[in-house]
UniProtKB/Swiss-Prot annotation:
Species, as recorded: Methanosarcina acetivorans (strain ATCC 35395 / DSM 2834 / JCM 12185 / C2A)
Requisite cofactors: Mg(2+)
Cofactor note: Binds 3 Mg(2+) ions per subunit.
Primary gene name: lysS2
Coiled coil start-end: none
Name under which the protein is recorded: Lysine--tRNA ligase 2
């Protein structure tokens, strides 16, 4: 008997959903389109396939350090044209690539008349060209290249922003990041730093024999954090799936499986508010190490960030607005209970629940109705009265058990768990635990979370029985840590908005 397999994808012939955004129109410049036609009419290809360079612009600029030796040296490079200045038989322009900018001179006597006319009449700022020429300095001492050959590599059809005003509108910069990167070199440097930051994290952990893994983004059960998920539907499987809110539960499954040092740099998705420190799609790293606890993970977090800051900035101080933040070790460590006493003069456990409610109301702290215990008021009042005062790096440790369903019970303090958060510039930057590895206790915690969810807490976690069963095979004592890449980049770059460090942040659809 032969079984027929249906490989037809039911989504193949489905129309696009009504809410897919297909709005917009092309924004090509009429004069640039006319120049494109002029280029084609000359038999030139406005979009050729490749160009051979013998150096980037930064490498060429270095040669000017020994100008006596390198004057007249022939170079071949490529980049985008900026700020074209025409002076009769001479045309100056800036040529920019990823590494820098240099002035180029197109002189009528150095090019055939037809080529000079082509450049003068048909090239624009924004075009990408390849050049060959010789190094020289102008009478004013500006390092330059005298062009003897040029090739159009890509004709731009959209006009760049006007030189002196540039691209200043924040909304436009976020929606058209490609344009932001073209005209704002300092914005490109932010993302160069971000790329180097991620590379340095990988190097730091690889040096300590951690292994990098990839875990599912589409999950049948979401978990690992208290957050609202994004929901989708898989047509072939006929079931709901969720975009991951954290990789935690899968990484701990790997530790159960025998990997003792694991990490993942992951894209996570949380269906939450958007503000200066939150984006629904964000990047973080989670690290787990067997036979370690939350004290070890605080040590690892401090060593990692201190080394990153020094390697990327050359020092330990970063500027955030009016604050200068010192990231040199050692960092302050204080319990949540102790921090509330130190920064707000408040001892939660010396007050009744009604008194704590009134304190919350007096300080205009929202969501006080959700607090039903001293532990929940401790977390609530800490967030409202202390967090924004933690400018220099500070580890807050020992959290109430009520809001930490994945952390191990404290070895000495009843009602608390071995959890820490790292605060910097008033922001939470990292979070870590001595990981809960008792499957019966984990099941109990999940069930308590599920009760909250059914009562309307949309950020409460669900029961993941497969994870509970994984713990049933034995998770060794384990320390874990999660660190926000976006916020760390903000700190290193001295920026106050998360949208400045995400290349394509989520934006509301334009009407």
């Amino acid at each position: 008997m032969t079984m027929e397999i249906n490989n037809t994808d039911p989504s193949e012939n489905m129309p696009l959903p009504d809410d897919v955004d297909l709005s917009g129109s092309r924004a090509f410049d009429d004069s640039k389109l006319a120049k494109l036609n002029g280029i084609i009419s000359q038999g030139l290809d406005p979009y050729p396939y490749r160009f051979e360079k013998n150096g980037d612009i930064c490498e060429i600029l270095v040669k000017f350090e020994d100008f006596e030796k390198n004057e007249g040296l022939s170079v071949r490079t490529a980049g985008r044209l900026y700020n074209i200045r025409k002076h009769g038989k001479m045309i100056f322009a800036d040529l920019g690539d990823q590494t820098g900018r240099i002035q180029v001179l197109i002189r009528k006597g150095n090019l055939p008349d037809e080529e000079f006319a082509t450049f003068k009449n048909l090239m624009d700022s924004g075009d990408i060209i390849g050049i060959q020429g010789e190094l020289f300095r102008t009478k004013r001492g500006e390092n330059s290249i005298s062009v003897s050959e040029f090739s159009l590599l890509s004709k731009s059809l959209c006009a760049l922003p006007e030189k002196f005003h540039g691209l200043k509108d924040v909304e436009t910069r976020y929606r058209k990041r490609y344009l932001d990167l073209i005209v704002n070199a300092e914005k490109r440097e932010i993302f160069v730093m971000r790329s180097k930051l991620i590379s340095e994290i990988r190097r730091f952990l690889a040096d300590r024999e951690f292994l990098e893994f990839e875990t599912p983004i589409l999950q049948t059960v979401y978990g690992g954090a208290n957050a609202r998920p994004f929901k989708t539907f898989h047509n072939c499987l006929g079931q709901n799936l969720f975009l991951r809110i954290a990789p935690e539960l899968y990484l701990k499954r790997l530790v159960v499986g025998g990997y003792e040092k694991v990490f993942e740099i992951s894209k996570n998705f949380r269906n939450e508010d958007i503000d200066t420190t939150h984006n629904p799609e964000f990047t973080m790293i989670e690290v787990y190490e067997a036979y370690r606890d939350y004290n070890d993970m605080m040590d690892l977090t401090e060593a990692l960030i201190s080394e990153l800051v020094f390697r990327l900035t050359g020092g330990y101080e970063v500027k955030m607005g009016e604050n200068t933040i010192n990231l040199r070790s050692p960092w302050k460590r204080i319990s949540m209970e102790g921090a509330l006493k130190e920064y707000a003069g408040l001892d939660v456990f010396s007050h009744s629940l009604e008194e704590l409610k009134q304190i919350a109301i007096q300080n205009r702290i929202e969501d006080y109705e959700k607090a039903k215990s001293h532990g929940e008021f401790l977390a609530l009042l800490f967030e409202g009265l202390v967090e924004d005062k933690l400018v220099n790096p500070t580890f807050i440790y020992d959290f109430p058990v009520e809001n930490s369903p994945l952390a191990k019970n404290h070895r000495e303090k009843e009602g608390f768990v071995e959890r820490f958060e790292l605060f910097l510039n008033g922001w939470e930057l990292a979070n870590g635990y001595s990981e809960l590895n008792d499957p019966l206790e984990q099941e109990k915690r999940f069930e308590e979370q599920d009760k909250k969810r059914k009562l309307g807490d949309l950020e409460a976690q669900t029961v993941d029985y497969d994870f509970i069963n994984a713990l049933g095979y034995g998770l060794p004592p384990t320390g874990g840590m999660g660190l926000g890449i976006d916020r760390l980049t903000m700190i290193l770059a001295g920026l106050e908005s998360i949208k400045e460090v995400i290349l394509f942040p989520q934006m509301k659809r334009e009407d």
